[in-house]
Amino acid sequence: MTNMNLKHKIFIMLLLVFCSSKIIAQQSQPNVLVFYVDDLRAELGCYGSKTAITPNIDKLATEGVQFNKAYVQQAICAPSRMSTLTGLRPETLGIYSIFTPLRSVHKDVVSVPQLFKENGYKTVSIGKVYHHGTDDKNQWTNYFTKEPNTYNKPENIALLEQFKKEGKKANGPAFENADVADEAYKDGRAAKYAVETLKKLKNDKFIMFVGFSKPHLPFNAPKKYWDLYDKNNFEIPERKKPENMYRLALTNWGELKGYHGIPNDVEYLDDNLTRDLIHGYHASISYVDAQVGKVMEALEALGLRKNTTVIFMSDHGYKIGEYGAWCKHSNEEIDVRVPLIVSRETSYKGRVAGKTSDALVENVDIFPTLVELCGLEGPKTDGKSILQVIDRPNTPWDQVATAVYARGKNIMGCTATDGEWRYTEWRDAKTQDILGAELYEHKNSLLSFKNLSGNTKYKKEEARMKGLLETQFPRNQGPFLQHDTPRN
């Protein structure tokens, strides 16, 4: 055999090995199913809620790893979702409001659907995934748009018709409990679309995002989910605000006040309306829980669970009367801490189930995690893969998680947590001058009622947390990047 023939044979053998390994790698790439829920704090049975009835999400937690200290990068829908889907923080993207679509500013940023589509995956978007439905619409091979809110009670339909005749741009009521089927409201339809799409894709490699709109306002859910709860059993949250908090730390919850029947000239809602809204929030959570159950049941029945990693997550937390406030829109612990459950495909030999982790993880970590999980080559991101924590929940991890919340274009709130303490600086967005600081202790509660910044007793804690904050937000970095489009 000549040297030339030997080299040729070796080349062919190496090529076959390479191609075979690539085929095996592609065959072992898991599918991904992501439940992306709107406005959901960790008000779930598996997270210790004494009130929420969530058997399907609780079951999912027993099948994977439940992260107790997961955080978003901004407590508002659009920037948070952009951060998840690009792996870039809001301060990197320069988008802090709901009025600026991602692609109106960033044409070349690589996103989750874009990367996975380029790598042969069927990419599916159902319901609210991005806040702006136009973002990356062409990167989804299957796209079911975010539907508008639905009202089913005749009196509410008539009310909206009246508003339309009068030329009023007004929202309907803040909650509804019509005695209708799940599909009469949009999240029931989202679950239906998800099940139908899974049947069509059972022989394909896919990544599917199912975006459930509840428990976002309005709290519209079928009556049977309201009937799970007795309104009078809900306790009224502590309404007092933290002592010495920064003047702009909380908003005036204008989002809720924009709904019909909500007074806009009061500091606090009365107990009766407060309980109605808390009731609606819980009914909406149980409604979403039932939809999660339907999709998971289909995943099992179709034989797809064995090769599908499932992620359950939220875009930010929420206040239902705590601090006398409502909705999100802050740097408070209750608004930036979120539920996160990850359950590996059942065929994975190293799969961990029924475990919790106190590792500090962030939604910005999801994209690089998916990249590693599926063996892809991804773009540079601000987040980092948490796959090793998913496989080994006690792995020592990050010391800090950070977030921002802008108050207009001139003031930026930047915040850091180590899982027990939260330190926030309110800065001039251009000069980085500190306008105010807050230090709160959260060892045992999402709520804290005294700003300890400047208290000599906690000088060491404040100095340490300030140092952690400045690792992400150095004072000498120059102005915060700003690409927000003015509201029309």
Swiss-Prot record:
Cofactor: Ca(2+)
EC numbers for this chain: 3.1.6.-
Location of the protein in the cell: Periplasm
Induction of its expression: By ulvan and rhamnose.
Record-listed Ca(2+) binding positions: 38-39, 77, 315-316
3-oxoalanine (Cys) found at: 77
InterPro entries: Alkaline_phosphatase_core_sf, IDS, Sulfatase_CS, Sulfatase_N
Keyword flag Calcium: yes
GO molecular function, one term: iduronate-2-sulfatase activity
Pfam families documented for this protein: Sulfatase (PF00884)
CDD domains in UniProt: iduronate-2-sulfatase
Cofactor comment text: Binds 1 Ca(2+) ion per subunit.
Keywords for the protein's UniProt record, in alphabetical order: Calcium, Hydrolase, Metal-binding, Periplasm, Signal
Signal peptide: 1-25
Active site: 77 (nucleophile), 131
Enzymatic class: hydrolase
Protein purpose: Sulfatase involved in ulvan degradation. Ulvan is the main polysaccharide component of the Ulvales (green seaweed) cell wall. It is composed of disaccharide building blocks comprising 3-sulfated rhamnose (Rha3S) linked to D-glucuronic acid (GlcA), L-iduronic acid (IduA), or D-xylose (Xyl). The sulfatase is most active on ulvan polymers, particularly on xylose-rich ulvan. It can desulfate oligosaccharides containing the motif Rha3S-Xyl2S-Rha3S and thus likely proceeds in an endolytic mode of action, removing sulfates from xylose residues in periplasmic oligosaccharides.
Family stated for the protein in its record: Belongs to the sulfatase family.
Name the UniProt record assigns to this protein: Ulvan-active sulfatase
Gene source species: Formosa agariphila (strain DSM 15362 / KCTC 12365 / LMG 23005 / KMM 3901 / M-2Alg 35-1)
Taxonomic lineage from the root: Bacteria, Pseudomonadati, Bacteroidota, Flavobacteriia, Flavobacteriales
